[in-house]
Design a protein with these regions (language model features):
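C-terminal motif of bacterial Sec signal peptides marking the signal peptidase cleavage site
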Residues: 9-13
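Long, acidic/polar, low-complexity amphipathic helices and coiled-coil-like
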Residues: 54-56, 71, 82-175
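Short edge beta-strands and adjacent turn/loop segments
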Residues: 37-59, 129-139, 174, 207-222
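Extracytoplasmic/luminal low-complexity segments enriched in Pro/Gly and acidic/polar residues
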Residues: 186-263
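N-terminal Sec/ER secretory leader and immediately downstream segment
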Residues: 25-101
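N-terminal export and membrane-targeting signals
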Residues: 1-7
Length: 263
């Protein structure tokens, strides 16, 4: 979120769809958040979302606040209800940050936690960003650009972001990089180092013109696009990528179905 300039959070009057404690908490947000320093408008709505009662919020925050000040606003919003007997998954808030957006889909991030995530977003120019309650902690999802479409350069740039460790209170950072060229969580040191080394494979094999990479549950799934059918080159990539990890590879010509798939 280059230059995260403003924050918008959404809230409106609560109609009592959820349990009584949730409804009271939603009303407290609607009543108290407009008075928080740095908030220019706030509405919360108690409504059914995905078949479940949720308190959804929108808050507009003063333009020109620093990252720390914006983090304080986010934390102060959840301070209103943090100690109430309500579930973190029953509340969601959308923040408009000038040129970017932050959604707290669930969870009650503190000022410090919100600030740390926005600092990472600033540094990576990530937009949008989502914070959610996950596995008893928080998880942040960041969509960030890659400055290069050259395979070796984009992979190295992506790996640099995947090395970013989650702030305190977050179990994981999930990244969607370069319009989903790379989709992966935070990597450990060994996995990141292996991918860095793999980047040097691409300049030696120019028939591979682009790739996508998905990493989930420790499995790397690579989709290669080649300028011509080069099965031996693809097999060589699979062997190089497979060192120390589980890998799936497929290769295709532009706009065509795969001509080779490696389990």
């Amino acid at each position: 979120m280059a230059g995260l300039v403003a924050v918008v959070l959404v809230l409106s009057g609560c109609s009592g769809i959820g349990n009584p404690e949730q409804t009271r908490a939603c009303r407290a947000l609607a009543d108290q958040v407009p008075g928080i320093a740095g908030v220019t408008r706030a509405t919360f709505t108690d409504a059914m979302v995905g078949g479940l009662p949720r308190c959804s919020g929108d808050v507009v925050v003063t333009q020109g606040l620093s990252t720390t000040e914006r983090g304080r606003v986010v934390g102060a919003v959840y301070d209103v209800i943090r100690t109430r007997a309500v579930k973190e998954v029953d509340f969601s808030t959308s923040f408009a940050l000038g040129g970017g957006t932050l959604t707290v889909a669930s969870g009650f991030p503190t000022s410090e936690q919100a600030t740390r995530v926005m600092e990472i977003a600033d540094a990576s120019h990530a937009d949008p960003v989502e914070i959610a309650y996950a596995r008893g902690s928080l998880l942040a999802t960041l969509h960030a650009p890659l400055s290069s479409t050259v395979p070796a350069a984009s992979l190295r740039e992506g790996v640099a972001l995947l090395r970013t460790q989650p702030p305190a209170g977050f179990v994981e950072l999930d990244w969607y990089l370069g319009q989903d060229v790379i989709v992966a969580p935070t990597l450990g040191v060994d996995d990141a180092s292996r991918l860095d080394l793999l980047a040097s494979w691409f300049p030696k094999n120019p028939a591979v013109t682009s790739y996508t990479l998905r990493i989930q549950a420790g499995v790397q799934t690579w989709t290669l696009v080649t300028s011509q059918e080069v099965p031996d080159v693809v097999r060589g990539f699979g062997a190089a990528a497979r060192a120390g990890t589980t890998v799936k590879v497929s290769a295709s010509l532009p706009g065509k179905p795969p001509y080779l798939t490696l389990p």
